[in-house]
Amino acid sequence: QTGFHKRKDEQQPLLHAPARKKLRSTSEYSCQTLFLNSENSDIKICALGEEWRLHKMYLCQSGYFSSMFSGSWKESSMNIIELEIPDQNIDVEALQVAFGSLYGDDVLIKPSRVVAILAAACMLQLDGLIKQCGKTMKETITVKTVCGYYTSVETYGLDSVKKKCLEWLLNNLMTHQNVKLFKELSINVMKQLIGSSNLFVMQVEMDVYTALKKWMFLQLVPSWNGSLKQLLTETDVWFSKQRKDFEGMTFLETEQGKPFVSVFRHLRLQYIISDLASARTIEQDAIVPSEWLSSVYKQQWFAVLQAEQDSEVGPQEIDKEELEGNSMRCGRKLAKAGEYCWRWTGFNFGFDLLVTYTNRCIIFKRNTLNQPCSGSVSLQPQRSVAFRIRLGSFDSRGKLLRSRTTGYRILILKKDQEQVVMHFDSRLLTFPLYICCNFLYISSEKRIENNRHPEN
């Protein structure tokens, strides 16, 4: 099963810009005289209605032909070989490039052709050409290529390219939302993205839910061709109409919705219901099963009691598994240089965290009495928070130009204390600058104890 739905190749300038790759040192004479002019050919290869007059000596560089000629295959002594091409990605042009790579030291790999050439290279076991296809892919990942690349490398086993595609998607899914990308992303890939703590979230977890809602609408109505600005309104209208037929069920409990359950399971609902407006929206949408929400409400109520009555001061050590799986994900785009101060919405168990960007520094402040706060604040002498900050700036194709991270850390703050948590070189600053944070305000051990049912 591939990672994306197939889509016709789009004619884009980037895709047709050839990437010149040096493969091996062979002479121009070999390429022109032996390959293109077929002089002194001792074997004819027939495939896809075309024929190539080639040389066994050169073909033996291919693992496929080397096995054929040295083994007990019937073709080992034949001068005319009919190649069966079971892979639909392989065409005549791809075979021409693959055979030519055995003779010449210069191969032109256009990004729009790289999948077909990779398919041919894998069939013929041309390790050098496979490697160069992978390099071309890594250098040309964009919103228009990422889906096709991911699909092909799942098929042909280029794990390093697959990793690069996933990194690109984690960085761009939320920061540079795109209608066509939402249409192409499969359930399997979306599940990996939504479940990751490395998802570059903009704003808060509610925005991840909103993006998922839009993605699900486009999966169900792929013919929709409006703009990104129109998408949320159209999505809400469509689901509103569907609710009339739900008969008391939420959408994920219907036959239409069941395929998407595994993706929505990765939402961190505890950070959605911690904000009143978000909690109301998710209830009104009737997409997420009420049992899921009830379970999270219970979990969060225990956490509130823990923070209020059990002298909870926050995490005392790094629990990477807990941070990866359950941390609050939030982010912000800084459009241009300047001073910024903000807080992310939601109830954080009395820890009112103010974030300031100024003079190439990011500062965290635990606000208690100095500034107004819409919710209650903890007056405990000290509170701790586990966090990670990531910074990134991107080029127009979504490639990460510069990045920096604090890694996971514990910060202990007294009442109204502030602390510089990141300071960076001005050379690293390219605006717009994207900031993404992970937070954990409550110790994981106590939360687990509070949620455990008493044994009979």
Region roles according to the model:
Residues 20, 24, 58, 253-256:
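Intrinsic-disorder-associated interaction segments
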